[in-house]
């Protein structure tokens, strides 16, 4: 891995990733046995298993804005899920100081049969907000999502764009020090995307830490100064974003338009 020198640290890391590895199985019918849970995690992979991430290490300090780049299937989303503690590593460790606002698989935590109102209270509550805090922010959440006419509509009847709007509006109101954003800015209309951009800029201005996974270089350059380049599950470059993108584009040149 290439690590570029950086300025001397001014604060303790908010994220420590040390020697992290995680295995998956290509054959979904395959299941790990109970015995596998206690097996040596460093053992050789079984047939059908592969390392989605292997021996990944880095630290992140408060206020850093990090773009994660790489081809599809190289471990970018898996890395964010590890930081969010949605999944656990097979090897190594992930330490996160404080909470995480996860804008990953953004509509996954919502309940189809509940109304928008109930989903706002449920999702925000699961992320640690009190009822009083949700009461105080409810109107601004709905106003941001621009769905006031659908507050008492079951979530399953919303369009896909509306679902993304309400999910972003809720998660972006969490007062967590770390923000994880995985391709969610690729959906929705142009005006709402710009609204999301401004909200992320507000969060960064508050000193939050950002992880952004995106194939849109313009988005990465807008928000991020540091880049992590993942390839075949390995962290092959950690340094300035411009150099991470240059390395990535050199290794995998864009295909010419047909």
How should each PLM-predicted stretch be described?
Residues 214-215:
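H-loop/switch region of ABC-family ATPase nucleotide-binding domains
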Residues 1-52, 241-256:
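Pre-NBD coupling/linker segments of ABC/ABC-like ATPases
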Residues 34-41, 121, 133-150, 167-169:
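Conserved ABC ATPase "signature" region
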Residues 222-229:
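Conserved catalytic segment of ABC-fold P-loop ATPases
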Residues 232-233, 248:
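Conserved ABC ATPase "signature" C-loop
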Residues 69-71:
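The feature captures the beta-strand-to-loop junction immediately N-terminal to the Walker
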């Amino acid at each position: 891995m290439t690590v570029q020198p950086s300025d001397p640290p001014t604060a303790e890391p908010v994220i420590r990733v040390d020697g992290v590895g995680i295995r998956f199985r290509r054959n979904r019918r395959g299941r790990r046995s109970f015995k596998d849970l206690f097996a040596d995690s460093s053992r050789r992979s079984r047939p059908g298993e592969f390392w989605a991430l292997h021996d990944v290490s880095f630290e992140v300090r408060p206020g850093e804005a990090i773009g994660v780049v790489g081809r599809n299937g190289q471990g970018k989303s898996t890395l964010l899920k590890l930081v969010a503690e949605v999944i656990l590593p097979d090897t190594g460790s992930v330490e996160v100081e404080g909470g995480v606002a996860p804008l990953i698989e953004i509509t996954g935590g919502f309940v189809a049969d509940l109304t928008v109102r109930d989903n706002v209270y449920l999702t925000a509550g699961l992320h640690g907000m009190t009822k009083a805090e949700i009461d105080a922010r409810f109107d601004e959440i709905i106003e941001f999502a621009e769905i006031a006419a659908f507050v008492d509509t079951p979530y399953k009847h919303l369009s896909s764009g509306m679902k993304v709007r309400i999910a972003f509006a809720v998660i972006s109101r969490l007062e967590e020090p770390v923000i994880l954003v995985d391709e969610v800015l690729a959906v929705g209309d142009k005006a709402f995307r710009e609204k999301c951009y401004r909200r992320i800029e507000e969060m960064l201005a508050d000193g939050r830490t950002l992880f952004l996974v995106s194939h849109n270089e313009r988005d990465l350059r807008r928000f991020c100064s540091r880049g992590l380049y993942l390839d075949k599950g390995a962290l092959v470059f950690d340094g300035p974003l411009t150099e991470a993108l240059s390395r990535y584009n050199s290794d995998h040149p864009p295909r010419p338009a047909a």
